[in-house]
Amino acid sequence: MHIESPIKRRQSTRIYVGNVPIGDGAPIAVQSMTNTLTTDVAATVAQINALQKVGADIVRVSVPTMDAAEAFKLIKQQVSVPLVADIHFDYRIALKVAEYGVDCLRINPGNIGNEQRIRSVVDCARDNNIPIRIGVNGGSLEKDIQAKYKEPTAEALLESAMRHVDILDRMNFDQFKVSVKASDVFLAVDSYRLLAKQIVQPLHLGITEAGGARAGSVKSAVGLGLLLSEGIGDTLRISLAADPIEEIKVGFDILKSLRIRSRGINFIACPTCSRQEFDVIATVNELEQRLEDLITPMDVSLIGCVVNGPGEAEVSHMGIAGSYRKSAFYEDGIRQKERFDNDNIVDKLEARIRAKAAMLSKENQIDINQID
């Protein structure tokens, strides 16, 4: 059942990336980044649409050349999810994609150039009502900051960020968010904690270059979990050396585990032992695949025996407590007369979950429409 998160979020200003609100209490936005060649318009559009299908609120696209900028124009015309253009080295690319309707510009202080170039980007962003992300990265700090600190430190990342925040402040430009990413969990966490005390703008969270699907997910969950539990963060990206689809799934799983934002089914499943009366692992894996299209938040417990099965089912939207041959079925915490054959749990439970999700979605829509 739904339990409110005890987390009190950091107060920040509000910006919009396309039609997606960021900060000031808005839902924490989950984003990913394409890994196709941007000049391959068809492949990039296909990947963006696939990311949107699994819940991406925002998608970032690398724009390394003017040819990529021209491709970005065509891409933007074919997708509906807000796009962030990732700009490094050549500030003129930012000016070009601004003409093509980009929803946000990500610039890297470590390589975008001098203050005059930054001012050109800011002026263009203001004229076109485009927000900016100041994206600091521990692996690409400015040379003078590298020389000063010798190695990436939280203070070094903070100095880089504040240097560019100050430029935007002097230009009276407040439509921006900031990130201070590092591949080390403690370095990233310390950097964000320092930054959160210095500015009121929204913060984009991430553990950069976190690694492969398994290790990177764990590293991201630890780092972002610490920050989110402290109320820090307004948007996030999980950086994995894996299919970008996994980044969105992991991002929502982290938010779901902290009760911050839910999307789809939250499966509560036991790790199994010799007491299990049905194949829990196979059941969970099959249901996760079959039901990944659902977006209605629901808790479903799948426990293989009667030790913890009834207790978990009583606090879930639906639950199975394993029993000999036929397992007990619960809905809204109440044990039902119907029992599920242990060899046919997946099919029957899928049908019940889909029906329940449709009902909850309809009820939620009615509640929204009744709000003045």
From Swiss-Prot:
Keywords: 4Fe-4S, Iron, Iron-sulfur, Isoprene biosynthesis, Metal-binding, Oxidoreductase
Enzyme class: oxidoreductase
EC annotation from Swiss-Prot or TrEMBL: 1.17.7.3
Catalyzed reaction equations: (2E)-4-hydroxy-3-methylbut-2-enyl diphosphate + oxidized [flavodoxin] + H2O + 2 H(+) = 2-C-methyl-D-erythritol 2,4-cyclic diphosphate + reduced [flavodoxin]
InterPro entries, per database record: Dihydropteroate_synth-like_sf, Enolase-like_C_sf, IspG_bac, IspG_bac-typ, NO2/SO3_Rdtase_4Fe4S_sf
Cofactor(s) listed: [4Fe-4S] cluster
GO BP terms, alphabetized: isopentenyl diphosphate biosynthetic process, methylerythritol 4-phosphate pathway; terpenoid biosynthetic process
MF terms in GO: 4 iron, 4 sulfur cluster binding; 4-hydroxy-3-methylbut-2-en-1-yl diphosphate synthase activity (ferredoxin); 4-hydroxy-3-methylbut-2-enyl-diphosphate synthase activity (flavodoxin); iron ion binding
Pathway: Isoprenoid biosynthesis; isopentenyl diphosphate biosynthesis via DXP pathway; isopentenyl diphosphate from 1-deoxy-D-xylulose 5-phosphate: step 5/6
Residues reported to bind [4Fe-4S] cluster: C270, C273, C305, E312
Cofactor: how and how many bound: Binds 1 [4Fe-4S] cluster.
Keyword presence, Chaperone: no
Membership in a protein family: Belongs to the IspG family.
Free-text function comment from the UniProt entry: Converts 2C-methyl-D-erythritol 2,4-cyclodiphosphate (ME-2,4cPP) into 1-hydroxy-2-methyl-2-(E)-butenyl 4-diphosphate.
HAMAP family for the chain: IspG
Name of the protein in its database record: 4-hydroxy-3-methylbut-2-en-1-yl diphosphate synthase (flavodoxin)
Organism of origin: Aliivibrio salmonicida (strain LFI1238) (Vibrio salmonicida (strain LFI1238))
Name of the gene encoding the protein in the UniProt record: ispG
